[in-house]
Each structure stands twice: as C-alpha cells, then as structure tokens.
Regions:
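Conserved nucleotide-binding/hydrolysis micro-motifs of P-loop NTPases
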Residues: 49, 63-68, 114-115, 140, ...
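Pre-Walker A adenine-sensing motif
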Residues: 9-23, 30
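Conserved ATPase-coupling elements of RecA-like P-loop NTPase cores
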Residues: 112-127, 151-154
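Internal gly/pro-rich beta-alpha loop/helix module
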Residues: 142-194
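Substrate-engagement module of ASCE P-loop NTPases
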Residues: 125-145
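Loop/turn-to-beta-strand initiation segments
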Residues: 56, 104-107, 136-142
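Conserved P-loop
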Residues: 24-102
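Short gly/ser/thr-rich secondary-structure transition/capping motifs
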Residues: 11-14, 88-95, 161-163
C-alpha cells in the first residue's frame, strides 16, 4: 500500500507561499482610456476615504498637471520628499524609494504606473518601484491609461496614430488586487482638455 501522507517539503513550500502573499501589499489601479478622465482625482478621493478610516496614507508621487481641483484634492495629504537626481545639466525630482520604505506607510499613492525613472534610480520603471513597495507589505494606489499596457500599445497606436513608449507589462496589471475603471463621456473629456 502506497504512503498517502503529504510530502512535508511541499506543505512547507505552500505555507511559505501563502505567508508571503498575506504579507505582500495590495495594488489598486485606477485605469482609464486616456489622459484627463480623472484617474488621479479618483485615486486621491479613494485615498481620502482611507485616511478618514484611520489608514496611514502618504503621497509618493502625484502629477496634478496644474488642475486646480486635483491640487485641492491632494491638499492635507502627507507628501513624501522627492529625491534630487542630477541629470545632464540639471537636477530632476524623482520618487524616493528608500525614503518610502523607511517611512513604511500603510498606503502610498504612486501616480503614472508606466513612468520611466531617471537614469541613476534603482529601477528603470515606476512599476518596479511599486513591486518593491508591495513586497515590503505597503499597499499602493496607482494610475495607468490603456495605451500604456504592453499588449494593447500597438492596437491603440493603430487607432489613434499616437504611440507611447512608456509601457507596463500585462503581468503587472493582471496581478493588481483591484482595478477601478475611470471614464468620462467624450464631450466632457474634450472640454476638460481645452
């Protein structure tokens, strides 16, 4: 008669994998069809709800693009200081991954998931920074447009005639714990972009 007991190594591997998943932060993506539909605004609104519920929320990086209503929504939220990175003949401000890991908030806002970091950063892409934050047990809210997804980049480019070069691997999007669709009727979007 064959031994029906489970393999102890397999059990240990399964338990370790489940513990790692339980400790990993959660990723929530605010997803839109184009710039200007209100992804950042929606992300800030959701973050404010978490703050009211007592969650330790900080802004890692948020791009308001000069929109007053978005700037107002960010008022009162803690901003992590950005890091100065010398680049050619100037100094650029970039997200400070080490500062965020040291601060270890419960939730961090990281706008523009597809952003390419400045040379000299630890990771080439913001989504890689986010993966490190998640691995450290920090929940992350981020934003992305459809044309930035690797598998849809060519399709959207073929329709719009505009190619974007900053993309996110589909596996990053697929691994999100939650995706919130943010959209506007076309005439409202056109009015907002004027």
């Amino acid at each position: 008669m064959a031994d029906q007991r489970p393999d102890p190594d397999q059990l240990l591997n399964r338990v370790n994998a489940e513990e790692a998943r339980a400790k990993r932060g959660k990723l929530k993506i605010f997803f839109g069809a184009s710039a200007g539909v209100g992804k950042t605004y929606a992300m800030l609104g959701a973050a404010r709800q978490q703050l009211l519920a007592g969650v330790d929320v900080v802004i890692g990086i948020v791009e308001t693009h000069g929109r007053m209503e978005t700037e107002v929504m960010a008022d009162g939220l803690e901003y992590l200081p950005l890091r100065d990175i010398p680049y050619r003949d100037r100094v650029l401000k970039e997200f400070d991954l080490d500062g965020a890991l040291a601060r270890k908030p419960a939730l961090i806002l990281m706008d523009e998931l597809a952003h390419s970091n400045v040379a000299g950063s630890r990771h080439a892409k913001r989504w890689q920074d986010i993966d490190e934050l998640l691995a450290a047990g920090i929940d992350v809210y981020s934003t992305v447009n459809v044309q930035h997804l690797e598998s849809l980049n060519d399709v959207v480019s073929g329709i719009t005639g505009i190619r974007v070069w900053e993309t996110v691997p589909d596996k990053v999007f697929d691994a999100a714990d939650e995706v919130v669709l943010v959209d506007l009727p076309p005439d409202e979007l056109l009015q907002r972009l004027q």
